[in-house]
C-alpha cells in the first residue's frame, strides 16, 4: 500500500513540482548539515532518557553527535559550530527529563517512544493509502489523558507566528488523528505538544507548546491531505512560484 508522511505532505505544499523532483524523479536535495546532525543526536538522547533514565545523557549525546557528524559530507560541516554545539548540547540534554517531569507531574506511564504509524486514510477513496509517521513520545497521566510529544531542536525558540503556522501544527493534528485511530482512543483524550529544545536560549531551554486540535483544525488538515493525494495521483505538478526563492533546485538543470 502506498503511503504519505507529513514530511512529504509539507514538501508538496511547498511546491508540487518540488515534490515531483524529490519523490518521483528521486533527485537528491538537501541531505543534512551540522544542525540536522545536532537534532538527530538530541532526539536519540531524549529517547534514551525516557526509556532508561540514563545517568549520563551528556555521554550519549556526545557519542551520537560525533556519529551523526561523521555521516555528513565534509563541505556540509561547520567545525566551529560543531564545537559550540558540543557544549550547548551537553547542557541541554541534562534538562530534558526534569522538564518533562515538571510539565507532567502526574505522568504515570510511558506508552511509546519513537512509535511508528501506518494507518489507512479512509477518506481517500481513489486507491488505498496509508499515513506514515513516527511519534517521538506518548505518555499517559493519571487523569486518563494521553500526551503526544514531538521534540523540536531550535536555536532560541519559536515566535508566535511559527507556533501557529498551519504547516507546523498540522503535523501534530494528523499524528493525533491517526494515533487515536490506531489505538481506538477517543480523540478528546489525546493532547499534543511540541517540546522546543533551545540550543542558544539563556532561560527556558525546554519549552512545551501545547497544540489544540479541534474539529475545524482537524478537518482543515485532513482536507489538505486529501488535496495533496488527489493531485499527486492525478500527476498534477505545477510550480508554486511563491516558493522559488527558497528552493534548492531554483535555476538548476532540474528547474531552470
Labelled PLM ranges:
Residues 41-44, 170-178:
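Short amphipathic alpha-helical face segments that pack within enzyme cores
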Residues 29-37, 164, 236-242:
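Structural motif
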Residues 29, 156-160, 203-206:
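Short small-residue beta-strand/loop micro-motif enriched in glycine and branched aliphatics
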Residues 9-54, 86-90, 94, 114-115, ...:
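Nuclease catalytic cores
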Residues 112-172, 180, 221-224:
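Non-catalytic protein-protein interaction segments used by genome-maintenance enzymes to assemble
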Residues 44-121:
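A non-catalytic, helix-rich entry segment at domain boundaries
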Residues 4, 94, 177-256:
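Metal-dependent nuclease catalytic regions and adjoining charged, substrate-binding loops involved
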Residues 25, 152-155, 196-198:
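A short beta-strand motif that forms part of the nucleic acid-binding face
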Amino acid at each position: 500500500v502506498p503511503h504519505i508522511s507529513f514530511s512529504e505532505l509539507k514538501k508538496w505544499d511547498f511546491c508540487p513540482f518540488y515534490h515531483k523532483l524529490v519523490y518521483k524523479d528521486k533527485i537528491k536535495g538537501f541531505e543534512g548539515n551540522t544542525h540536522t546532525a545536532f537534532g538527530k543526536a538530541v532526539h536519540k538522547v531524549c529517547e534514551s532518557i525516557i526509556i532508561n533514565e540514563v545517568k549520563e545523557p551528556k555521554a550519549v549525546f556526545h557519542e551520537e553527535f560525533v556519529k551523526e557528524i561523521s555521516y555528513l559530507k565534509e563541505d556540509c560541516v561547520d567545525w566551529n559550530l560543531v564545537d559550540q554545539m558540543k557544549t550547548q548540547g551537553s547542557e541541554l540534554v541534562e534538562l530534558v527529563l526534569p522538564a518533562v517531569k515538571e510539565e507532567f507531574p502526574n505522568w504515570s506511564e510511558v506508552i511509546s517512544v519513537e512509535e511508528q504509524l501506518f494507518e489507512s486514510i479512509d477518506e481517500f477513496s481513489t486507491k488505498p493509502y496509508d499515513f506514515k509517521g513516527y511519534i517521538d513520545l506518548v505518555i499517559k497521566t493519571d487523569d486518563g489523558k494521553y500526551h503526544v510529544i514531538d521534540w523540536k531542536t531550535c536555536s532560541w525558540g519559536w515566535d508566535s507566528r511559527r507556533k501557529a503556522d498551519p504547516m507546523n501544527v498540522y503535523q501534530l493534528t494528523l499524528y493525533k488523528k491517526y494515533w487515536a485511530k490506531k489505538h481506538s482512543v477517543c480523540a478528546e483524550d489525546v493532547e499534543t505538544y511540541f517540546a522546543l529544545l533551545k540550543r542558544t536560549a539563556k532561560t527556558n531551554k525546554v519549552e512545551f507548546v501545547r497544540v489544540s486540535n479541534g474539529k475545524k483544525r482537524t478537518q482543515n488538515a485532513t482536507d489538505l491531505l486529501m488535496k495533496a493525494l488527489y493531485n499527486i495521483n492525478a500527476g498534477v505538478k505545477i510550480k508554486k512560484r511563491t516558493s522559488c526563492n527558497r528552493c534548492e533546485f531554483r535555476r538548476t538543470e532540474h528547474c531552470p
